[in-house]
Design a protein with these regions (language model features):
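N-terminal cap/lid subdomain of alpha/beta-hydrolase-fold enzymes
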Residues: 27-43, 84-212, 503
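Alpha/beta-hydrolase fold nucleophile elbow
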Residues: 235-248
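Short alpha-helix in the alpha/beta-hydrolase fold that links the catalytic acid
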Residues: 255-256, 369, 373, 480, ...
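Catalytic histidine-centered segment of alpha/beta-hydrolase-like enzymes
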Residues: 521-532
Length: 558
């Protein structure tokens, strides 16, 4: 689930909610059909040499009064590496092996010239009775972190079944329940939910160092190889293909757009960026970095509007209009004021502080004390302090009592919006994967896992940024459509920051026309809010329609 700025990554690289490298190897030779067993449990295979059995089950779902028949496939694909071709040059390798271990590795490699490196767990949904399955759209989905499984999208967004929440996304009392998803996308696209290595049930093989998968480029390469392998195993090279990432998953998706084209010649029809962060400079609150203070301000305003903390004239406006006014101020007067720093005249500083107070509901005195800068953490703990409540980071509609009411302490607070969904989704998945998908494993399903230190490679001490990967892919592929979803109450990946990053990609007019933004009155996981989930599906239908109904583009006309 979470996406964390660099200063917090060392201790917090866990979940939710980032082109280079060689391949894991040539396509595996086993026929997929030989590994499938309908409606029978698939036990985790501890032998690295064996191809795991996939559990395939048949289901029927009613959507808009019509039966939707489909098959679900749960299990692993094994990522393998050709000798002398590491995933990414300079990536972490396995610890030094003994002579006996080396002999075993040589024996395994001798079978097909490939060494098993990791098992990637996935759940795929494929519609039945399709005239030409090869032509049916296929959407690959993953969450972020880094260190998050795909459970959030899988159990709350577009799969056929979902964890039951209230219409606003609140958790009901346990025991939790599953229900049919009225907003599933399966009537429009087949779906594949991917758990990156070290998350969910995905693991490296014995003697393999998980760190070789824990990095910006390493992660992109491993998910890219999974997509290639799944596409080949299931004869889907001619299918329209979409990649959907959420949070840090958008960082990964943008990187994949260029990697898949360059490494495998796999050109996508669309990229969906849910709660986008392509440039981590927009999230890192430091005194010398003005970007996050500017980028978060409109989200502070919409959050304050939701909690009725603004003046009467602003409260009377729709949230979209409040967002527009805050954008204008943030991108003009506020940007200039921060740029002037210590040279800003006192009178102008007073004026800016008053405007900041007007848009955020926080006292002007607080802004004056803090050089006109309020971080996200301070905002979470300050807006409702007089009520002894804190805000949700992922969804600022959610509030909770403070750990230390009646004090100014704000350390070690929790996220009420995270707590609202983690329990229901985790319980729902662990029951669903066994009871309905017939997949068995005794290892824990890691919804989030600490994958630090995360290797940011070329970013070094700078900021990870895959916006340029996306720019290159869009420039080379004129048919690549990009859809960015933004939420007004998302205080993890603010909408104005996402807009600014995309606006700075230096695209020509024709290429820029392939971009679209949609907005939701929800939080980071927009789909837990029932009205937003319904809108999300409708917006996907419009996006898919445009992505699949394009006319050939003459290169001379570009």
């Amino acid at each position: 689930m979470p996406t964390f700025p660099l200063s917090r990554l060392a201790g917090l690289l866990l979940a939710l909610s980032l082109a280079a490298g060689a391949t894991f190897g040539a396509e595996m030779k086993a026929d997929l059909k030989a590994t499938l067993k309908d409606d029978k449990p698939a036990k985790e295979d501890a032998k690295a040499e064996e191809e795991p059995v996939l559990s395939v089950t048949a289901h029927t779902l009613m959507v808009n009064g019509q039966p939707l028949k489909y098959h679900a496939t749960a299990g692993y694909l094994i990522l393998k590496e050709e000798e002398g071709k590491p995933l990414v040059k300079g990536a972490a390798s396995a610890p030094a092996a003994s002579d006996a271990d080396k002999a075993k590795e040589d024996e395994k490699r001798a079978k097909d010239g490939l060494t098993p490196k990791a098992k990637v767990f996935f759940v795929a949904y494929t519609l039945d009775d399709v005239a030409d399955p090869a032509k049916r759209p296929l959407t690959f989905c993953f969450n972020g972190g880094p260190g998050s499984a795909s459970i959030w999208l899988h159990m709350a967004a577009m799969a056929p079944r979902r964890a039951r929440l209230t219409a606003d996304g609140e958790a009901p009392p346990p025991p939790y329940q599953l229900e049919d998803n009225e907003s599933t996308w399966l009537d429009q696209t087949d779906l594949v939910f991917i758990d990156p290595v070290s998350t969910g049930y995905s693991r490296t093989f014995p003697k393999e160092n998980p760190a070789q998968f824990h990095g910006l480029k390493e992660d992109i390469a491993s998910i890219g190889d999974f997509i290639r392998l799944y596409t080949s195993r299931n004869t889907r090279w001619l299918s329209p293909k979409i990649v959907l990432g959420e949070s840090y998953g958008t960082t990964r998706a943008a990187g994949l757009s260029d990697y898949l084209q360059g490494r495998y010649g796999l050109y996508l029809n669309g990229i969906i960026l849910v709660s986008s962060v392509l440039n981590f400079q927009t999230l890192e609150f430091t005194p010398q970095n003005n970007d996050p203070y500017i980028g978060f301000l409109p989200s502070y305003a919409t959050t304050a509007w939701y909690h009725q903390k603004l003046s009467a004239d602003l409260q009377a406006k729709p949230v979209a209009e409040v967002a527009a006014l805050a954008r204008t101020f943030a991108g003009t007067d506020y940007t200039l004021a921060l740029a002037r720093g210590d040279t800003l005249p006192a009178a102008e500083k007073q004026r800016i502080a008053a405007e900041l107070s007007r848009f955020t509901g926080l006292p002007a005195k607080l802004y004056l004390q803090r050089r006109l800068r309020v971080s996200d953490a301070l905002f979470f703990s300050s807006l409702l302090r007089d009520e002894d409540k804190i805000l949700g980071r992922y969804d600022a509609r959610f509030t909770g009592p403070r750990y230390e009411p009646g004090t100014d302490a704000s350390s070690d607070e929790y996220d009420p919006s995270d707590e609202a969904v983690t329990g229901p989704l985790t319980a729902a998945f662990n029951d669903y994967v066994r009871r309905e998908l017939k997949f068995e494993s005794d290892i824990p399903y890691e919804t989030t896992w600490d994958v630090s230190p995360w290797n940011f490679g070329d970013a070094g001490s700078g900021f990870p940024n895959t916006a340029d990967d996306l720019r290159k892919a869009m420039t080379r592929n004129p048919y690549l459509k990009i859809w960015v979803t933004c939420s007004y109450y998302d205080l993890a990946t603010p909408f104005f920051a996402a807009e600014n990053v995309v606006a700075s990609m230096n695209l020509d007019a024709a290429t820029r026309a392939n971009l679209r933004f949609t907005y939701y009155e929800a939080g980071h996981m927009l789909y837990i809010h029932q009205p937003s989930r319904a809108k999300f599906k409708a917006d996907f239908g419009a996006f898919l329609h445009d992505a699949l109904r394009q006319q050939p583009v003459r290169s001379a006309a570009r």
